Design a protein with these regions (language model features):
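Conserved GNAT acetyl-CoA-binding A-motif
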Residues: 122-133
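Glycine-/small-residue-rich active-site loops that bind phosphorylated ligands and cofactors
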Residues: 89, 106-107, 137
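Conserved beta-strand-loop-alpha-helix junction that forms the acyl-donor binding cleft
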Residues: 132-142
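Conserved catalytic-core motifs of GNAT/GCN5-like acyltransferases
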Residues: 133-134, 146-165
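Conserved acetyl-CoA-binding loop-helix of GNAT-fold acetyltransferases
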Residues: 99-101, 107-120, 124, 143-147
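Residue-level recognition of the GNAT/N-acetyltransferase active site
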Residues: 98, 102, 135, 171
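GNAT-family acyltransferases
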Residues: 1-96, 159-177
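Short secondary-structure boundary/hinge segments and terminal tails
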Residues: 123, 140, 162-164
């Protein structure tokens, strides 16, 4: 079982090791990480994502966003997920949430459980639905979204790839399979 926890300064060493595992596998984009994949200073990243949780301090070019690590029973970081409370023009095709599971922990249902738990966060935040984008060729993520009640809405081109937008009704029990 996993739980979602907010990144803290105390998790620095573990978080850097988590990020490095992606890089070691040739993956230099960590979806749902609020640019953790591009940030060298973990403490500054923690401050930035904390600021983005509040209307008074959110970056003016961004939206209120909650970012969580998923930790397992041994308190090891196994994934990351974010929840963007609204969509601006930039995010309209990217959706309300992104997520990644560390390469060594994939195909264990972690992404499905992270998204299920994030639906509870969205519900508490008063959100009625989430829009999620996924590249058509990312079958594991498509299955994760569908398992959590995702309904296909439309397709679009993204970085020369075909991608789809799915919608999940937050207030529906279908989101809690």
């Amino acid at each position: 079982m996993i739980q979602l926890v907010r990144p803290t300064e105390e998790r620095k060493e573990q978080a850097v090791e988590f990020r490095q595992e992606f890089f070691d596998h040739g993956e230099f984009v960590i979806n749902g990480s609020e640019l953790f994949d591009k940030t060298e200073d973990y403490i500054e990243w923690c401050r930035s994502i904390d600021a983005n949780t509040k209307e008074e301090t959110v970056n003016p070019d961004w939206v209120i966003t909650d970012t969580f690590f998923a930790v397992d029973d041994q308190d090891r970081i196994v994934g990351i997920i974010d929840l963007r409370h609204t969509l601006n023009d930039f995010l309209k095709d990217l959706g309300n949430c992104g997520y990644s599971v560390r390469p060594s922990e994939r195909r264990k249902g972690i992404a499905t459980e992270m998204l299920r738990q994030l639906l509870d966060v969205a519900k508490k935040a008063g959100m009625k639905e989430l829009h999620l984008s996924v590249e058509k060729n990312n079958e594991p993520s498509v299955k994760t979204i569908i398992r959590n009640g995702g309904v296909y809405e439309r397709s679009f081109d993204f970085d020369e790839e075909q991608a789809d937008i799915y919608r999940i009704a937050v207030n529906s029990e279908i989101g809690y399979l």
